Regions:
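Canonical positions in the second alpha-helix
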Residues: 88-89, 122-123
Length: 151
């Protein structure tokens, strides 16, 4: 019985649907506008942190747990485990840009630049002003020897 319960919990993401999540587009647009008018770098950094708070807010608790596990694994240097968690997140929430961005980061750290680029393009398609994904794409293109494309 315990085995069945454990297997059902592991399979939950395969049977669940990720909710649409909160539409933060107006808040992001406001933060971008304020960043462009920031009087100095310090003010822009505060606003950048606000954007990260928005992007790191997953659509539901399950997605948040997957994201948190992935980012914690990245921080601990276990990039393969991070990739596994983030693959689950992307499969569960294919419309959540930060899942792709974090998986791209894990790929980048493993030197898998082509994989990172695919995920960064997906994140940018979902969230065109995702500064983390845009910056990550530029850095990835540089690593691929495509510095001219990074500009």
């Amino acid at each position: 019985m315990k085995t069945i319960l454990a297997l059902s919990l592991l399979a939950a993401p395969a049977f669940a649907d990720c909710p649409a999540g909160t539409d933060y587009s107006s808040q992001i647009a406001t933060v971008v506008e304020r960043m462009q008018a920031a009087p100095h770098e310090g003010a822009a950094r505060v606003l950048s942190a606000q954007m990260w708070d928005i992007w790191l807010d997953a659509p539901d608790e399950l997605a948040q747990a997957m994201l948190d596990a992935g980012t914690a694994s990245i921080q601990m240097g276990d990039r393969m485990v991070a990739t596994s968690h983030l693959e689950e997140l992307v499969a569960y929430c294919p419309d959540y840009a930060e899942g792709y961005n974090q998986r791209a980061f894990a790929s980048f750290l493993q030197g898998k630049y082509d994989d990172a680029l695919v995920d960064l393009d997906a994140a940018i398609a979902l969230q065109p002003v995702h500064l983390g994904a845009l910056t990550g794409k530029a850095l990835t293109l540089i690593e691929l020897g495509r510095a001219a494309d990074a500009q």
